[in-house]
Amino acid sequence: MACYRLIIHGRLPGLNEYIDAERRNRYLGAKLKAEAESVIRAEIAAQLRHVKIRQPVRMLYRWYESSRRRDKSNVCAYGRKVIEDALVGAGVLENDGWGEIDGFVDRFFVDGENPRVEVFLCTADAPGIESWSQIIAWEPPPKKPRRKRAPGKKDAGK
């Protein structure tokens, strides 16, 4: 199975931000989308330089947000569309329709120090589809629990 990984560093605009921009001015919404696509295309050029996928793919999105402030659907709804449009614009995918994208799965994590989106593009008709389920089930390693402070002088008399 051919799988490709694309990492988009930073935070993409959410659906609410796009809707707000469109309501203010339709050109502002178009500008927001163009800026997001430009950032994504730069990442594609650096990471997927000569990749051209001409068969259906299954896509796994791993959304790493800096906090839980934005709701999950706001994070991924607009982001998926912009990412897929950038992949088509860069020539990695021929189109983003039903014939080219077999399905997608979203996973969400919090990483305050390194917000990003990891996109896996896996060919859908390749043998060894069990590795696709392994990718979906993958979890980042757990963070080490914080050590509790030893009681200080203030707490000693309690």
Residue ranges and their predicted role:
Residues 1-158:
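Catalytic phosphate/metal-binding cores of nucleic-acid and nucleotide-processing enzymes, i.e., regions
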